[in-house]
Curated annotation (Swiss-Prot):
<feature type="binding site" description="in other chain">
    <location>
        <position position="106"/>
    </location>
    <ligand>
        <name>5-phospho-alpha-D-ribose 1-diphosphate</name>
    </ligand>
</feature>
<feature type="binding site">
    <location>
        <position position="109"/>
    </location>
    <ligand>
        <name>5-phospho-alpha-D-ribose 1-diphosphate</name>
    </ligand>
</feature>
<keyword id="KW-0328">Glycosyltransferase</keyword>
<dbReference type="GO" id="GO:0005737">
    <property type="term" value="C:cytoplasm"/>
</dbReference>
<feature type="binding site">
    <location>
        <position position="105"/>
    </location>
    <ligand>
        <name>5-phospho-alpha-D-ribose 1-diphosphate</name>
    </ligand>
</feature>
<feature type="binding site">
    <location>
        <begin position="37"/>
        <end position="38"/>
    </location>
    <ligand>
        <name>orotate</name>
    </ligand>
</feature>
<comment type="subunit">
    <text>Homodimer.</text>
</comment>
<dbReference type="GO" id="GO:0046132">
    <property type="term" value="P:pyrimidine ribonucleoside biosynthetic process"/>
</dbReference>
<dbReference type="Pfam" id="PF00156">
    <property type="entry name" value="Pribosyltran"/>
</dbReference>
<dbReference type="InterPro" id="IPR004467">
    <property type="entry name" value="Or_phspho_trans_dom"/>
</dbReference>
<keyword id="KW-0808">Transferase</keyword>
<dbReference type="InterPro" id="IPR000836">
    <property type="entry name" value="PRibTrfase_dom"/>
</dbReference>
<comment type="pathway">
    <text>Pyrimidine metabolism; UMP biosynthesis via de novo pathway; UMP from orotate: step 1/2.</text>
</comment>
<dbReference type="GO" id="GO:0044205">
    <property type="term" value="P:'de novo' UMP biosynthetic process"/>
</dbReference>
<dbReference type="GO" id="GO:0006207">
    <property type="term" value="P:'de novo' pyrimidine nucleobase biosynthetic process"/>
</dbReference>
<protein>
    <recommendedName>
        <fullName>Orotate phosphoribosyltransferase</fullName>
        <ecNumber>2.4.2.10</ecNumber>
    </recommendedName>
</protein>
<comment type="similarity">
    <text>Belongs to the purine/pyrimidine phosphoribosyltransferase family. PyrE subfamily.</text>
</comment>
Length: 225
């Protein structure tokens, strides 16, 4: 499930301007050599994270998904959930609603409040917020944490859907990691933008048009139908 096209296009341009989205030749986590690279960790200033959170908030509002709170899986999801909650608090569609959020620690704390969870108690319908889905490990762990607390995972909200098939080259799945997550947990995965949005920008922008053939070839080999 992608966000509105105007928002998606704006986000791709924003990612390029911030150096988060780059073109070239990159060895990615899956072991593949990709003609583009998306590193959300480079949204690393107050202004860039603030604007990023506005994109997350808008994508969630546009999705129409009913939710009660946000959850950010450690570590990248922590600032994303926090900033998105702030952005939602100021979003006109929320009509003044104050959305709670929580996140987990990788290591349990044995003093103070203790445990692995920080923030609001997990309850109701919870949206998991992360940057991308590669293998789905973070989502699986988040779902287990949310269900263990008696709450319901409502959706996953990510920045970019690479729209590529999961698995090694000699045993490619017909589905992407995003599709597998949606099917396994029976909940939607909402992305601010996708590979299709990147290709749309490459087609319409002379500055980056030279990268389009390489990205198309990559999609032809690994892209989901």
């Amino acid at each position: 499930m992608a966000a509105a096209s105007a928002t998606s296009t704006d986000f791709v341009r924003f990612a390029l301007d911030e150096g988060v989205l780059r073109f070239g030749s990159f060895k990615v986590k899956s072991g593949r050599t990709s003609p583009y690279f998306f590193n959300a960790g480079l949204f690393n200033s107050g202004a860039s994270v603030g604007r990023l959170a506005q994109f997350y908030a808008q994508a969630l509002v546009d999705s129409g998904i009913a939710f009660d709170m946000l959850f950010g899986p450690a570590y990248k999801g922590i600032p994303l959930a926090t900033a998105t909650a702030v952005a939602l608090a100021g979003h006109p569609a929320m009509q003044g609603r104050d959305v709670p959020f929580a996140f987990n620690r990788k290591e349990a704390k044995d003093h103070g409040e203790g445990g692995t969870l920080v923030g609001a108690p997990l309850q109701g319908r919870v949206v998991i917020i992360d940057d991308v889905i590669t293998a789905g490990t973070s989502v699986r762990e988040s779902v287990e944490i949310i269900r263990a607390a008696g709450a319901e995972p409502a959706a996953v909200l990510i920045a970019l859907d690479r729209q590529e098939r999961a698995g090694p080259d000699d045993a490619l799945s017909p589905h992407s990691a995003v599709q597998d997550v949606a099917k396994t947990y029976g909940m939607p995965v909402v992305s601010i933008a996708s590979l299709a949005d990147i290709l749309a920008l490459l087609q319409g922008d002379a500055q980056f048009a030279g990268n389009r053939e390489a990205v198309l070839a990559y999609r032809g080999k690994y892209g989901v139908v």
